[in-house]
Amino acid sequence: MAKTPMRVAVTGAAGQICYSLLFRIANGDMLGKDQPVILQLLEIPNEKAQKALQGVMMEIDDCAFPLLAGMTAHADPMTAFKDADVALLVGARPRGPGMERKDLLEANAQIFTVQGKAIDAVASRNIKVLVVGNPANTNAYIAMKSAPSLPAKNFTAMLRLDHNRALSQIAAKTGKPVSSIEKLFVWGNHSPTMYADYRYAQIDGASVKDMINDDAWNRDTFLPTVGKRGAAIIDARGVSSAASAANAAIDHIHDWVLGTAGKWTTMGIPSDGSYGIPEGVIFGFPVTTENGEYKIVQGLSIDAFSQERINVTLNELLEEQNGVQHLLG
């Protein structure tokens, strides 16, 4: 019996990240190889963006994906999010030359307020929302606060890129395959302040911390490399990391919908007060997922260094959150 198609709304659909993302969604990489999808693609209502979106859709058509059950272009969030089961909020205002962080937060607050309200009004009540557009945690917070009729837990931010970056650095350091690393995760904000934590990580049952056994490497090499990886890629390629961000978005939704089979991963989610993170702050936590629900991994001890790092990333998030509070009505 063929499954009912799932409606996937994607914003910023003519942008760089989506050029890597949409083809993989249509190919079944995100929701499974037996799950048909309908793509509902939102772009800003200017002629150039809408024309570019038509071009992307022509290419998607030309792939003749068996799982693609439909595809529509939109300039209005109210139609783009109609009955959506999954929403990937990729489009965001990038930081322009001479733009203060405060200006960036305000510009994005407008976008994510409008989108949050539209999701609240027309999307499926079980919608799963992932915010990719930066500042992702705070944009997710704005969307969540703009959708009061939906459960807060439906709104998440992408920490999976930091998580995957951390995995690849640990694999390189230990000489072990990425697939053998378990119980690694990331705390906090998707920003250079994030704290990738391998104190509990294991490779084939052995402790990664004991294998590496180098606090200076953790502090001076590993954490800065993961935290500043985005900047390093811009420096090398001249453009921001789009394909790896798209891949992380696929991973995040895949694991949320299809489950992690007991394995730990990282999601930016509204805090329930765990680990002293104030309730409602969108924060990176170690989670497991099952039957479309995520659960924070509990009972981990936090040493002094970890607490210090968690406090830094939390304070940054609280500052961002306070900076947009007046825009949330």
Swiss-Prot record:
<feature type="binding site">
    <location>
        <begin position="12"/>
        <end position="18"/>
    </location>
    <ligand>
        <name>NAD(+)</name>
    </ligand>
</feature>
<dbReference type="GO" id="GO:0006108">
    <property type="term" value="P:malate metabolic process"/>
</dbReference>
<comment type="similarity">
    <text>Belongs to the LDH/MDH superfamily. MDH type 2 family.</text>
</comment>
<protein>
    <recommendedName>
        <fullName>Malate dehydrogenase</fullName>
        <ecNumber>1.1.1.37</ecNumber>
    </recommendedName>
</protein>
<dbReference type="GO" id="GO:0030060">
    <property type="term" value="F:L-malate dehydrogenase (NAD+) activity"/>
</dbReference>
<feature type="binding site">
    <location>
        <position position="101"/>
    </location>
    <ligand>
        <name>substrate</name>
    </ligand>
</feature>
<dbReference type="InterPro" id="IPR015955">
    <property type="entry name" value="Lactate_DH/Glyco_Ohase_4_C"/>
</dbReference>
<comment type="subunit">
    <text>Homodimer.</text>
</comment>
<dbReference type="InterPro" id="IPR036291">
    <property type="entry name" value="NAD(P)-bd_dom_sf"/>
</dbReference>
<feature type="binding site">
    <location>
        <position position="134"/>
    </location>
    <ligand>
        <name>substrate</name>
    </ligand>
</feature>
<feature type="binding site">
    <location>
        <position position="108"/>
    </location>
    <ligand>
        <name>NAD(+)</name>
    </ligand>
</feature>
<dbReference type="InterPro" id="IPR010945">
    <property type="entry name" value="Malate_DH_type2"/>
</dbReference>
<keyword id="KW-0816">Tricarboxylic acid cycle</keyword>
<dbReference type="GO" id="GO:0006099">
    <property type="term" value="P:tricarboxylic acid cycle"/>
</dbReference>
<keyword id="KW-0520">NAD</keyword>
<dbReference type="InterPro" id="IPR022383">
    <property type="entry name" value="Lactate/malate_DH_C"/>
</dbReference>
<dbReference type="Pfam" id="PF02866">
    <property type="entry name" value="Ldh_1_C"/>
</dbReference>
<dbReference type="InterPro" id="IPR001236">
    <property type="entry name" value="Lactate/malate_DH_N"/>
</dbReference>
<keyword id="KW-0560">Oxidoreductase</keyword>
<feature type="binding site">
    <location>
        <position position="165"/>
    </location>
    <ligand>
        <name>substrate</name>
    </ligand>
</feature>
<feature type="binding site">
    <location>
        <position position="95"/>
    </location>
    <ligand>
        <name>substrate</name>
    </ligand>
</feature>
<feature type="active site" description="Proton acceptor">
    <location>
        <position position="190"/>
    </location>
</feature>
<feature type="binding site">
    <location>
        <position position="115"/>
    </location>
    <ligand>
        <name>NAD(+)</name>
    </ligand>
</feature>
<dbReference type="Pfam" id="PF00056">
    <property type="entry name" value="Ldh_1_N"/>
</dbReference>
<comment type="function">
    <text>Catalyzes the reversible oxidation of malate to oxaloacetate.</text>
</comment>
<dbReference type="InterPro" id="IPR001557">
    <property type="entry name" value="L-lactate/malate_DH"/>
</dbReference>
<feature type="binding site">
    <location>
        <begin position="132"/>
        <end position="134"/>
    </location>
    <ligand>
        <name>NAD(+)</name>
    </ligand>
</feature>
